């Protein structure tokens, strides 16, 4: 099997606090892979190791390997900026740039990184990304408006479009529906099912129900340890570990 991300003996510390403990994990290429577990189990920390965003925290220390399509992204000769071009990130709170128009929110990464050669190419890429994020039809007549008037779900899809415009190979999502209403959540979950045909999506979720709805594979983390990993249906219908069973049935919060 072709793996998009592999961790080898991954350990993460915040100061003296050991938050990810000896995790070996393989994330297949393409599809939705959910990291699930209760609050404080290390899900978001692990996600941030996959694009080296963890290094923005001065107290963080990473040991072991994280391989992106076979390459250890923590090797000394690897530029974290180049890693983040390949690995997009969507955060829990919809965070479009409020001072930029809808158009410029999508275009900014392309401009800053010189990824397009003409205004025509930029227009095409912005339209493509907004269509990929299932937002084009809702905003095509107001691209010069600011995102403040968009709903929470629309703002999050705008952020997804901003990430997709860079044409990443992997998309990391840290509880992307946690602060969005049920209608917006349903649209984003539907979008994930479409995007997984072309991307590897790693989704952090506190909701076993959401993982069951959208994930092809799931990993259950508890207190920084990888308890169980496998195809979503198997983990939910026939978990091997008692802790996993308690979590997916709601007995462990």
UniProtKB/Swiss-Prot annotation:
Gene Ontology molecular functions: ATP binding; ATP hydrolysis activity; ATPase-coupled phosphate ion transmembrane transporter activity
UniProt cross-references to InterPro entries, sorted A to Z: AAA+_ATPase (IPR003593), ABC_transporter-like_ATP-bd (IPR003439), ABC_transporter-like_CS (IPR017871), P-loop_NTPase (IPR027417), PstB-like (IPR005670)
Topology in membrane: Peripheral membrane protein
Pfam family, one: ABC_tran
Subcellular location: Cell membrane
SMART domains (UniProt xref): AAA
Domain of life per record: Archaea
Stored Gene3D superfamilies: P-loop containing nucleotide triphosphate hydrolases
Annotated ATP binding sites: 37-44
Keywords noted in UniProt: ATP-binding, Cell membrane, Membrane, Nucleotide-binding, Phosphate transport, Translocase, Transport
Disulfide bonds: none
Any single GO BP term: phosphate ion transmembrane transport
Transmembrane recorded as keyword: no
Reaction(s) this enzyme catalyzes, per UniProt: phosphate(out) + ATP + H2O = ADP + 2 phosphate(in) + H(+)
Function: Part of the ABC transporter complex PstSACB involved in phosphate import. Responsible for energy coupling to the transport system.
Family stated for the protein in its record: Belongs to the ABC transporter superfamily. Phosphate importer (TC 3.A.1.7) family.
Name listed for the protein in its UniProt record: Phosphate import ATP-binding protein PstB
Organism annotation: Thermococcus kodakarensis (strain ATCC BAA-918 / JCM 12380 / KOD1) (Pyrococcus kodakaraensis (strain KOD1))
Recorded name of the encoding gene: pstB
């Amino acid at each position: 099997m072709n793996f998009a991300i592999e961790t080898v003996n991954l350990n993460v510390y915040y100061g003296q606090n050991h938050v990810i403990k000896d995790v070996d994990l393989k994330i297949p290429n393409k599809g939705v892979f959910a990291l699930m577990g209760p609050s404080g189990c290390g899900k978001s920390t692990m996600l941030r190791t996959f694009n080296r965003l963890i290094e923005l925290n001065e107290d963080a220390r990473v040991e072991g390997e994280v391989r992106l399509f076979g390459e250890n992204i923590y090797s000394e000769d690897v530029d974290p900026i180049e890693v983040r071009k390949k690995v997009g990130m969507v955060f829990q709170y919809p965070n479009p740039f409020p001072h930029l128009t809808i158009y410029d929110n999508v275009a900014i990464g392309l401009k800053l990184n010189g990824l397009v050669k003409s205004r025509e190419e930029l227009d095409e890429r912005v339209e493509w990304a907004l269509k990929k994020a299932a937002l084009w039809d809702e905003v095509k007549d107001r691209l010069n408006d600011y995102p403040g008037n968009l709903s929470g779900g629309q703002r999050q899809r705008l952020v997804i479009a901003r990430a997709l415009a860079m044409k990443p190979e992997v998309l990391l999502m840290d509880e992307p529906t946690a602060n969005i209403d049920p209608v917006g959540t349903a649209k984003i979950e539907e979008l994930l099912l479409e995007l997984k045909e072309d991307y590897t999506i790693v989704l952090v979720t506190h909701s076993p129900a959401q993982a069951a709805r959208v994930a092809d594979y799931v990993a259950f983390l508890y207190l920084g340890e990888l308890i169980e990993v496998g195809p979503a249906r198997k983990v939910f219908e026939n978990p091997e570990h008692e802790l996993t069973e308690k979590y997916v049935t709601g007995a462990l919060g």
